[in-house]
């Protein structure tokens, strides 16, 4: 007997780009994918990559939160949020979905639920490495608490853009970036807290390990079955 659920499960394209992808190239790639999703010529997609050292400004970014505009290339991202750093050792996952349809626990046309579920995806991914990620009601992203000092540091950022209910941009999880590079901005406009990474917490995992954890935790939340991770 065939499993009817297996026959009707929706898949989503997952792929990863080797090397460092310049930020403008990523924007162009997402714009092309989003246009295809809208007209039915391209599938929904999760795109895994790293950027060269880059500062990006969300729609709420303030000039005074960028300390050295000439330190790294700086781009207006068009996504929600404030200043973000991207660089080697940080796993960026760009998620492109048609939100006019439900996706797992995310109802159709519910942006708040979508953002909440992106955070939950990161929290479940971190749990696979014995790291407790937490939400904060007044701060978007995922946070960890230093058991020794009680300090809260950000380990993952997220920012999304929605165009006619097709979403793009996504999440950035700090695996092993140079944390000093964050010093050129006030990350996400939050001065009271710092940033951390899996390596800084003592978990010497690879980007590949993180990719598999992201993929393993996807389906229960978003409903679709990830394809094997291919090369973009």
Swiss-Prot record:
Q: Which reaction does it catalyse?
A: octanoyl-[ACP] + L-lysyl-[protein] = N(6)-octanoyl-L-lysyl-[protein] + holo-[ACP] + H(+)
Per UniProt, subcellular location reads as: Cytoplasm
* Site (Lowers pKa of active site Cys) location in chain: 154
One matching Pfam family is LplA-B_cat
Q: Does the keyword Transferase apply?
A: yes
Does Transferase show up as a keyword for this record? yes
Taxonomically, the superkingdom here is Bacteria
Q: Name one GO cellular component term.
A: cytoplasm
Give additional notes from the record.
Answer: In the reaction, the free carboxyl group of octanoic acid is attached via an amide linkage to the epsilon-amino group of a specific lysine residue of lipoyl domains of lipoate-dependent enzymes.
Q: Write the protein's name.
A: Octanoyltransferase
Q: Which organism is it from?
A: Gluconacetobacter diazotrophicus (strain ATCC 49037 / DSM 5601 / CCUG 37298 / CIP 103539 / LMG 7603 / PAl5)
What gene is this protein translated from? Answer: lipB
């Amino acid at each position: 007997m065939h499993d009817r659920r297996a026959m009707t499960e929706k898949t989503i394209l997952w792929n990863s780009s080797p090397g460092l992808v310049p930020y403008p190239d990523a924007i162009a790639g997402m714009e092309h994918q989003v246009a295809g999703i809208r007209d039915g010529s391209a599938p929904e997609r999760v795109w895994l990559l790293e950027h060269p050292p880059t500062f990006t400004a969300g729609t709420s970014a303030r000039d005074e939160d960028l300390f050295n505009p000439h330190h790294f290339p700086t781009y207006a991202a068009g996504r929600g949020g404030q200043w973000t750093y991207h660089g080697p050792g940080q796993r960026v996952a760009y998620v492109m979905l048609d939100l006019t349809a439900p996706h797992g626990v995310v109802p159709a046309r519910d942006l708040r639920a979508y953002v909440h579920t992106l955070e939950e995806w990161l929290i479940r991914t971190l749990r696979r490495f014995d790291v407790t990620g937490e939400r904060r009601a007044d701060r978007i992203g995922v946070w960890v608490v230093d058991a020794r000092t009680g300090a809260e540091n950000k380990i993952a950022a997220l920012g999304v853009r929605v165009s006619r209910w097709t979403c793009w941009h996504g999440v950035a999880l700090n695996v092993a970036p140079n944390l000093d590079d964050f010093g050129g901005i006030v990350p996400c406009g939050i001065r009271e807290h710092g940033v951390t990474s899996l390596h800084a917490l003592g978990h010497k995992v690879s980007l590949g390990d993180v990719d598999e954890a992201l993929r393993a935790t996807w389906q229960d939340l978003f409903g679709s079955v990830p394809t094997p991770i291919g090369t973009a």
